[in-house]
UniProtKB/Swiss-Prot annotation:
UniProt name for this protein: Uncharacterized membrane protein YhjC
PANTHER family per the UniProt record, alphabetical: BSL5891 PROTEIN
Disulfide bridge positions per record: none
Localization in the cell: Cell membrane
Keywords of the record: Cell membrane, Membrane, Transmembrane, Transmembrane helix
Residues annotated as transmembrane: 3-23, 34-54
GO cellular component terms listed in the entry, alphabetical order: plasma membrane
Entry keyword rRNA processing: no
Topology with respect to the bilayer: Multi-pass membrane protein
Pfam family for this entry, one: DUF3311
Domain of life: Bacteria
Amino acid sequence: MKLIHVLAALPFIGILLGIPFANKVTPYVFGMPFILAYIVMWALLTSALMAIVYVLDKENKKEEAE
């Protein structure tokens, strides 16, 4: 499996499998319940990971060269 496929799958795995473990309210992160902070963190990480996938993907470089 290529690195870009693993990077693209990380947000899906993190959100899907991490929610049962992060399902807590008591620790507050920046004034938000932990579960909400966890989802916001993954939304930001997803954007960063997709940017990395875009940069690493060789197909995008072919389109820019044309």
